């Protein structure tokens, strides 16, 4: 029996389904796709694994086409976004069409942004296939592509019709990608739920061995938190900013090192440690909390230090372009306890320099 979580946004509310074999659940999918013209957007890694299965599930719904993109963060740009528009236009797809995002965070972000733009908005659904996309990027309506000068700088808030999370996809996920997803899972515990953080500490081996019950619980709890936050603050004017814990530092790492060289979750992991160390420098938390965060990230084989090649100037030039900057002030999400975080807008750059140089 699939778990269901509702993202409550009035007329734009939608369900998240979490369970096994959901990509073969034609009954659920038919509610959103029956008699529609469907374009499945996927990538060259996911297509051999799941494209035919999804096509077979949707075979009776209507016209189905697909577009297969290159795999990787380095392809999340306007040039490759255009491939989706070209596929839609070549097939004369109109406003009654639906895009299906079948893949990880890159595919979900690009498909959602394409849906937001095409003919000023068409429906799309999310079928995330990586842990990171299942617990984070597929929920909440953030869609975007990257620019060479900054991550996710060109995008829109645009909600899906439904999110289908099939946990069986994780059986084919490379270990490095699974670890990257765990960085976002751990983030939820740090910024929102201390009990969940402790549960993660106690269930490392169950999660790493892909225990179904543990995975469903972890994914469900993350989606519950994300749904709660998004329902309160869809466009990140307040509490939703807390979901960016580790991301200001992390996005700087991704941009500086070249998109795709560090996975998003790896950069977030290192960024989360830098955020915790900044909080410690400001007297917000003590060393024991930093140690718990570092130890849990390390337990999932995640990096806890920034690249040695990055100095303070490398970080700060990217952080000044961060989307959360207001009035020229860098705004950082910092933990104030396990289970709590706040946004700080006046962290001295001298403090950041000390943290980065000593990390």
From Swiss-Prot:
Pathway: Metabolic intermediate biosynthesis; chorismate biosynthesis; chorismate from D-erythrose 4-phosphate and phosphoenolpyruvate: step 2/7. CDD domains: DHQS (cd08195). GO terms for biological process: amino acid biosynthetic process; aromatic amino acid family biosynthetic process; chorismate biosynthetic process. It is found in: Cytoplasm. The keyword Lyase applies. Its EC number is 4.2.3.4. Disulfide bonds: none annotated. One of its GO terms (cellular component) is cytoplasm. Belongs to the sugar phosphate cyclases superfamily. Dehydroquinate synthase family. This is 3-dehydroquinate synthase. The gene is aroB.
